[in-house]
């Protein structure tokens, strides 16, 4: 089954948008455009770029818009026009939204995953990542099959620096402050749907599929 829909997920860190995206990407042959994944890939390939933005990432701050905009736009240019995709983690600011509109990055539907702060902290404190392939796991929602090793390459799993409780709280505050005008814009466009991210991932996916 293939979809050509252009989809945006809006949700705080820990809302499940990355995991949900991967489920839909596999089922509907969509391209997953995660700013986090794009940055990690670029950092692993370009030491000069890594040095430039490492301070932002380690403190939980957003990278300057011009850097994020270029990274996302360069990636989208490589995607065929009839190919569906999921934007995950972009746009996060009004400046990024304006860049999207100006550069013709169009969307068919927007899903806003609403979740309580205490649930976010609980979920993120249980996140683990593979250092080699960047696959993510969650001890609450998506456990690795082999203890604390990656299912794909048996590499030891780690906790990211920005998943520490004090940084999580900072990330939640920044997200809440930046997301309101973006949500208001898409509300006026009539393409935004609100989802309860407190429910299971399976229940959330079933709701999303009603609009695909």
Curated annotation (Swiss-Prot):
Pathway: Purine metabolism; AMP biosynthesis via salvage pathway; AMP from ADP: step 1/1. ATP binds at residues 14-19, 127, 136-137, 199. AMP binds at residues 35, 40, 61-63, 89-92, 96, 160, 171. GO terms for cellular component: cytoplasm. Zn(2+) binds at residues 130, 133, 150, 153. InterPro entries: Adenyl_kin_sub, Adenylat/UMP-CMP_kin, Adenylat_kinase_CS, Adenylate_kinase_lid-dom, ADK_active_lid_dom_sf, P-loop_NTPase. GO terms for molecular function: adenylate kinase activity; ATP binding; zinc ion binding. Catalyzes the reversible transfer of the terminal phosphate group between ATP and AMP. Plays an important role in cellular energy homeostasis and in adenine nucleotide metabolism. NCBIfam families: adk. This is Adenylate kinase.
């Amino acid at each position: 089954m293939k979809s050509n829909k252009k989809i945006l997920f809006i949700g705080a860190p820990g809302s499940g948008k990355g995991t949900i995206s991967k489920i839909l990407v596999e089922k509907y042959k969509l391209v997953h455009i995660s700013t986090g994944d794009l940055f990690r890939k670029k950092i692993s390939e370009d030491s000069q770029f890594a040095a430039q933005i490492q301070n932002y990432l380690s403190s939980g701050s957003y990278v300057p818009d011009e850097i994020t905009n270029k990274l996302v736009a360069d990636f989208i240019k490589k995607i065929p026009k009839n190919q569906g995709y999921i934007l995950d983690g972009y746009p996060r600011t009004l400046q990024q939204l304006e860049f999207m509109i100006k550069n013709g990055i169009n969307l068919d539907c927007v899903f806003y995953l609403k979740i309580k702060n205490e649930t976010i902290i609980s979920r993120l404190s249980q996140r683990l990542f593979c250092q080699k392939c960047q696959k993510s796991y969650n001890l609450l929602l998506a456990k690795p099959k082999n203890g604390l090793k990656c299912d794909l390459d048996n590499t030891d799993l780690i906790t990211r620096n920005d998943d520490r409780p004090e940084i999580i709280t900072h990330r939640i505050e920044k997200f809440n402050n930046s997301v309101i005008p973006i949500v208001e814009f898409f509300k006026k466009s009539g393409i935004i749907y609100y989802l309860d991210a407190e429910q299971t991932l399976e229940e959330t996916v079933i709701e999303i599929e009603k609009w695909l």
